[in-house]
From Swiss-Prot:
Name this polypeptide is given: cAMP-dependent protein kinase regulatory subunit
Quaternary structure annotation from Swiss-Prot or TrEMBL: Tetramer, composed of 2 regulatory (R) and 2 catalytic (C) subunits. In the presence of cAMP it dissociates into 2 active monomeric C subunits and an R dimer.
UniProt GO MF annotations: cAMP binding; cAMP-dependent protein kinase inhibitor activity; identical protein binding; protein kinase A catalytic subunit binding
Organism: Eremothecium gossypii (strain ATCC 10895 / CBS 109.51 / FGSC 9923 / NRRL Y-1056) (Yeast)
GO annotation, biological process: adenylate cyclase-activating G protein-coupled receptor signaling pathway; cellular response to glucose starvation; cellular response to nitrogen starvation; negative regulation of Ras protein signal transduction; positive regulation of protein export from nucleus; positive regulation of transcription by RNA polymerase II; protein localization to bud neck; regulation of cytoplasmic mRNA processing body assembly
Residues annotated as binding 3',5'-cyclic AMP 2: 341-457
Keyword Secreted applies: no
Amino acid sequence: MVLSQEHRDLLDAFQKEVEQRRPGDLLQFAANYFNKKLEEERLFVRSQESLALSKGVVLFPGSEGCGANRAAGSPDARKTGEDEDVMFKLPFVEHDPHSRHIYDDNKHGHDSCDPHTSFSREPGAGLFQGGYNMGQEAQKEAQTDFDPKASEVSSILKQRNVPRKSGVNSKPLPMNFNAERRTSVSGETLKPDHFSDWTPENYTEKTREQLKGLESAVGKNFLFNKLDSDSKTLVINSLEEKLVSKGQEIIRQGDEGDYFYIVEKGTVDFFLDDRKVNTYGPGSCFGELALMYNSPRAVTAVAATDCVLWALDRLTFRRILLSGSFKKRLLYDDFLKSMPLLKSLSNYDRAKLADALETEYYEAGQQVISEGDVGENFYLIEYGEADVSKRGVGVVQHLKKGDYFGEVALLNDLPRQATVTATTKLKVATLGKSGFQRLLGPVVEVLRLNDPTRADKR
């Protein structure tokens, strides 16, 4: 088994702790060390959403979290679960040593969301139940409990002559039973309201020359196009320099991916099933999928020459991305709430709208839209003022903070009906055509009623 860089870093940190503390009982020290790491990670993942909720922002729409599980663990829910326990048990659970303890705990009414219940009746039982000869008393207790529901279902099955599968005599599943299925991907759950004072572990200020090259590479990559300037700078300063010798493997096909790379110097060859398929040089990037989710590497990358690479890990990137999105939601939330036009939107709809908005700046005298142009965006004024003018007529309207424009072209699929020019420094939030149709919902009808080009408005 080839360990990922993330796993190697974790083990290296543990080794340093061992060398520094020189524990007498290594096993106990290891258990305490990794339990503490797990606790810190859980605290980080489950950090409170109170700041966001106080602003009316829904960070993770549709996610019920452990609250839903506790509700499901109520007496009524458990009763329903017991009725279905035997007939609808997962088909592979009997052969899975990792899931056996979950079944046993649920049978005894344990709440799987409570971190304290994972440390159960016997030392180590919560961590090592099932299949590994640990926590045996807990397993025996689960096996000797009399389940009247199971007996009742058994008698029904016998009457119908339906053979009942035995977990004792069943043959274990073959190791490659899932080999032809599509590989799954995953990603960590993060809570961005915990990031206020967070600094990336590998944060280092880059030189002007390094910044120039890295900004060019980052700027043309689709993952970073929508980041604001502060987030882009944070990404660049979080990149870690890696020196790779000629012939050294950088990533291996099928391995877990957790790093994104930018080539500063040298060339990298890519192989698919031992067949060379591509070569990248300075300024190129690879490994983008690793920043989005934990997916296996699609190819093998080998340094064709000595290389200087810059690497960014997935967790750092996602923290930067979510921190920026979180701040953006908080920033736009009060602004969107203050607009009479958007009062009909729910908190959830406002959160989605805030995510889709982009910020643009204009200096006094600069045109935002021009009469006759194709309309692609809807605009909301965050601060500043602008004039609306028409050819042959002159200025027809003056706009200020909280006003909007650009809706006519999107509502009626027409060219721009007027020119909007900034009269002071202007900051606007823009929404693209697809977002306008998809996210504004009932607001679109209000805009139609106020459309100045309507026949009954003339």
